[in-house]
Each structure stands twice: as structure tokens, then as C-alpha cells.
């Protein structure tokens, strides 16, 4: 937007407001009865004018630099800039804007450059595992605090021995899915509208080049894992557009523990990652999202909870208790990291593990409180069970996957190739070309692919294990359902009606106070706390009564 356009918008906003004030003060005041339809029309016009004024002012403030164009924390932005600006920006200013340089010729030139990118290929095709650690950072980076013991011995050991560095992330305190999006796709969130979550906009309907799609070309099986609701940030919809073949959410896990604040503990992820690796004969790519460190954190001591690690001298006194609770949660996350490393070390398959924090936790940090001086930085580390040279490199979240793949001799996909070959450009040129490439892939004519995207949405399978029904029978005015892979999220529907379901074991469910008849249709569906059905298994009944539960002999 040019300076002249900004001035014209500002003048228009001022003129509209001045006109409304003038009419209100100078127009004749008549005591008449106004028809309801006219009143509604007048009110609608006034609301539209006010909305346009708010939008115009918001755009003016945005482009003049009076307010930020990027919201690292949407909730904090609402507090800082107010509802009108944030709402208008979030609703209307979406997507990646088309550059004046975007053209078929421009993209042909870029495509030619990237097609000639030469990365030293490797004969290794290791399993590749990414673990995104919720709200995870090293608390010793907070200046002045005292800890009764080291909360992250495993992670700090990895940082000192393996390739690692600071990771600049697009969010602070919230917005996990935006760091997640950058890491998987290599796309810069700053190129979208302020406060936008692509998972909830473009990614619900469009496929996008990603690390999963790139590795699928090389024969990898692709898995996503998250120990929280599958519908959170619409991941159950988005992951098929990012190239994943399976997605194991909390609704497909059994036997996990919860934190005092109700989040699943991360130790469950070791077994789920192992299950994904064991599910195929070939190499696997596993993208894992943890949740244990998630806020909110208790502001007062919790009854029955005794922290293992004591924290003193936290710089925000009123958040002292909350931070101590947080430190103890990430201490448990560090234990999970140690267990995962041990498990992967014992496997015969070559494996690379990438660990990183998605953002800092929700505390009133300023840059000055942190030893690294940036609240939009976490850390990453690259571990492997085979020899890799140790490097220290600070990078952006949208550069992480390309960097890891380059270390492994992998160069697939145009965004990955761009990051691997163009980072030495002047920053302005590097980011400008990246934005044009992003626009072409998501919103443009797909010139980089010759006019049509090569990617198709996958038929996403929820969970690794098949949920099966092997038998349904009546016993003592109770319906029993036998099968496999049942858990606390399994619910029974009979002829379309949902019934209260009790899990007896992972192989047996029961519904009290009812009997089934021949040809009744029994469904076991997986539903989370939001009651959205993620998958279902169907069984048509044969009529019989069992003398006892779990008796598979028909009498």
C-alpha cells in the first residue's frame, strides 16, 4: 500500500466520522414514527459505516507502524490494541498477499534455480522423529532465579553434546500450531495476516508442500502423534493436507496419567512413537506434539501436590507459585526425553530425533529477564544413534526442517530447496522471494509445479492400531462388545443411538440395561471431550445370549 493510499484512507475515515457527527448535530429532529424495516435499514447502514471506519483506521495504523502487524500472542494483542483493531485484522487481513513481482516469468526463473540445487546426497535413510515440546524452555535462562536442583539434566546434556541452537519462533505463550506449521512446511507465519492460524483458515481446504510429503516421495511412512484432543487446532482435518498417513491423538491412547491441571503426561509418547516405528517394515517419519507443559498454571499451592523442585526469586513475584509448578512439569518432560533417547538407542534402525520448544510459557517475561535476551526464542537439538558432526546454529522455526534434511543429504520440495540454497541472500531478498513462493503454492497459480499441485490429501487413518469388534452378545440385561484396542474414549452406538459405555478392558466394553436383537447395528466410535466422532467400527449382530461375559462360545 502506497503513502497516497494510506492518506486517502485516513481522509476517508475522518470524512465519514465528521459526516456522522455533523448529521447528528445539524439535521432536523422530528418526532415521527419510523417503520421497523426503515429503522433496521438505517441501523444497518450506520453499523456498516462504523465498521468501515474502524477497518480503515486499523489499516492506517497498521501500515504507518502505529500498531504491530504480527501478533505473537493473540490474547495479549487484544489487551494491548483493543477489540476493534485485532478483530478486524484477524477476520479481514488473512492469507498471503500477492506481490507485484509475482508472474509466470518470475516463477519460471525461480523454478529453474531450485531445480538445479545440488545437495550432497547421503546413502542413509534413517527414521526421522520430530518432537515439539509444549511451552518448553530452559528455566535457568531466567535471570536471578534459584532452583533446588537442575530440572533439565537430559536436555542440557543433549544441548552440550549434539547439534543445537536457538530457535526463533512466531509466538509467545500460546499459538503452538503456528510454530508447528512453520516447522513442517518451511513457510513464514509473518507472511500471513496478524494473528492468523493457517490451520484454521487455508489449511482446512488446501494441501501444502511439507516435510511429510517430501519424505513420502522417498518412501517414508508418515505419522503424527499428539497426546491431546485430535480436533484441537483442527489437526484431524489439517494433517491429511500435510501428507500424514496416520494420526494418533489422545482418543487412541490408553493408560496415560494426567497432570494436576488435567493435561496428559508426556511419558505416554515413548510407547506411541515406538508403535509408529514398529508399524511398518521401512523407514518412518514421525511428527510428535507433546502437551504436558501446557498452561494455565496454578497461582496458589495445590492441595495434595508437593513439588519435587523448589524455585525462589522468580522476577514476577505474583507468578512464583505458577512458575514452580511449571518447572516441575518440564522436569517430568525431561525424564520423558531421557526415556525416549534410551528407547531409540536400543533400536537397530538408524534414527534421528529433533527436539524443540514451540514457545515460552505464559508468564510475564520481558526480553531483559532472559539470558538470551529474546522471549521469542526457544532451543532445538538434533540427536542420532549414529555419528553426526556437532554444529551450533541459530535458526528460524521455518528453517528447521530444511536444515535437518540438509544435514541428512535430503533435498525434496521447492520450499525446502529454497531454504537450503538461498539463505546467503540479503535478508530482504531472501524473505521477499520466500513470500512469493509461498503465495504461488497456497494462493497463486502453482507455477512452481507447472500449474497444478503434485500433492493429494491423504486418507488419514486415526490411530495406528485397528479398532475391531469381534463379537456382540447379551448377558444379564447387559450388552457386551468384544474386540480390540478399546479405551476410555470408545463409545457404543446401537442402531444410531449412543449409550453410556463402560470400558472393562481394552478388549471388552459393556452397556447396561439393554439387549441387542438380530441384525441390530453396533458401532464403536472414538470421541473426545468435544464429542466429535473421529472414527468408527461397525458390527451387525447375530442373536444369542452368552452364559457369561467374555464367553465366545455360542450356546
Each language-model region and where it sits:
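Solvent-exposed soluble domains appended to multi-pass membrane proteins
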Residues: 115-126, 133, 138-502, 508, ...
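Generic cytosolic/nucleocytoplasmic N-terminal low-complexity/intrinsically disordered segments
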Residues: 35-37, 544, 552
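N-terminal secretory/membrane-targeting segments
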Residues: 1-126, 147-166, 201-205, 209, ...
Amino acid at each position: 500500500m502506497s503513502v497516497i493510499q494510506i492518506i486517502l484512507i485516513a481522509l476517508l475515515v475522518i470524512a465519514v466520522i465528521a459526516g456522522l457527527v455533523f448529521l447528528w448535530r445539524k439535521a432536523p429532529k422530528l418526532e415521527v414514527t419510523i417503520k421497523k424495516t426503515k429503522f433496521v435499514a438505517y441501523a444497518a447502514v450506520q453499523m456498516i459505516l462504523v465498521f468501515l471506519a474502524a477497518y480503515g483506521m486499523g489499516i492506517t495504523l497498521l501500515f504507518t507502524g502505529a500498531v504491530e502487524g504480527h501478533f505473537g500472542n493473540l490474547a495479549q494483542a487484544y489487551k494491548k490494541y483493543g477489540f476493534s483493531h485485532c478483530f478486524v485484522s484477524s477476520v479481514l487481513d488473512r492469507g498471503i498477499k500477492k506481490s507485484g513481482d509475482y508472474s509466470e516469468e518470475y516463477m519460471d526463473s525461480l523454478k529453474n534455480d531450485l531445480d538445479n540445487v545440488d545437495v550432497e546426497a547421503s546413502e542413509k535413510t534413517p527414521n526421522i522423529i520430530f518432537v515439539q515440546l509444549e511451552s518448553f524452555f530452559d528455566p535457568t535462562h531466567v535471570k536471578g532465579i534459584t532452583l533446588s536442583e537442575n530440572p533439565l539434566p537430559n536436555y542440557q546434556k543433549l544441548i552440550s553434546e549434539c547439534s543445537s541452537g536457538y530457535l526463533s519462533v512466531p509466538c509467545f505463550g500460546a499459538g503452538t500450531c503456528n510454530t508447528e506449521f512453520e516447522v513442517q512446511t518451511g513457510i513464514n507465519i509473518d507472511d500471513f495476516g496478524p494473528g492468523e492460524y493457517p490451520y484454521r483458515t487455508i489449511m482446512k481446504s488446501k494441501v501444502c508442500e511439507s516435510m511429510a510429503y517430501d519424505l513420502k516421495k522417498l518412501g517414508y511412512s508418515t505419522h503424527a502423534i499428539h497426546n491431546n484432543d485430535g480436533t484441537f487446532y483442527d489437526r484431524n482435518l489439517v494433517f491429511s493436507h500435510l501428507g500424514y498417513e496416520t494420526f494418533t491423538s489422545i482418543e487412541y491412547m490408553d493408560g496415560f496419567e494426567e497432570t494436576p491441571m488435567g493435561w496428559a503426561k508426556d511419558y505416554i509418547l515413548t510407547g506411541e512413537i515406538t508403535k509408529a516405528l514398529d508399524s511398518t517394515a521401512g523407514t518412518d517419519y514421525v511428527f510428535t506434539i507433546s502437551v504436558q507443559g501446557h498452561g494455565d498454571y496454578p497461582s496458589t499451592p495445590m492441595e495434595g501436590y508437593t513439588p519435587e523442585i523448589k524455585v525462589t526469586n522468580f522476577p514476577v513475584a505474583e507468578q512464583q507459585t505458577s512458575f514452580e509448578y511449571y518447572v516441575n512439569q518440564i522436569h517430568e518432560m525431561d525424564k520423558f526425553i531421557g526415556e525416549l533417547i534410551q528407547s531409540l538407542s536400543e533400536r537397530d534402525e538408524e534414527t534421528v530425533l529433533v527436539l524443540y520448544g514451540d514457545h515460552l510459557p505464559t508468564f510475564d517475561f520481558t526480553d531483559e529477564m532472559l539470558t538470551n535476551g529474546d522471549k521469542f526464542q526457544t532451543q532445538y537439538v538434533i540427536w542420532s544413534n549414529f555419528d553426526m558432526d556437532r554444529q551450533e546454529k541459530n535458526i528460524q522455526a521455518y528453517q528447521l526442517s530444511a536444515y535437518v534434511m540438509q544435514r541428512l543429504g535430503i533435498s525434496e520440495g521447492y520450499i525446502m530447496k529454497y531454504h537450503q540454497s538461498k539463505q546467503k541472500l540479503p535478508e530482504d531478498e531472501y524473505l521477499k522471494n520466500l513470500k512469493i513462493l509461498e503465495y504461488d503454492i497456497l494462493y497463486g497459480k502453482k507455477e512452481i509445479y507447472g500449474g497444478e499441485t503434485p500433492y493429494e490429501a491423504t486418507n488419514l487413518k486415526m490411530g495406528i492400531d485397528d479398532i475391531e469388534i469381534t463379537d456382540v452378545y447379551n448377558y444379564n440385561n447387559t450388552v457386551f462388545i468384544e474386540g480390540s484396542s478399546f479405551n476410555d474414549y470408545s463409545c457404543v452406538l446401537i442402531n444410531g443411538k449412543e449409550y453410556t459405555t463402560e470400558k472393562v478392558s481394552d478388549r471388552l466394553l459393556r452397556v447396561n440395561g439393554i439387549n441387542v436383537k438380530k441384525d441390530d447395528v453396533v458401532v464403536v466410535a472414538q470421541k473426545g471431550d468435544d464429542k466429535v466422532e473421529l472414527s468408527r467400527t461397525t458390527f451387525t449382530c447375530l442373536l444369542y445370549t452368552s452364559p457369561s461375559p467374555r464367553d465366545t462360545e455360542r450356546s
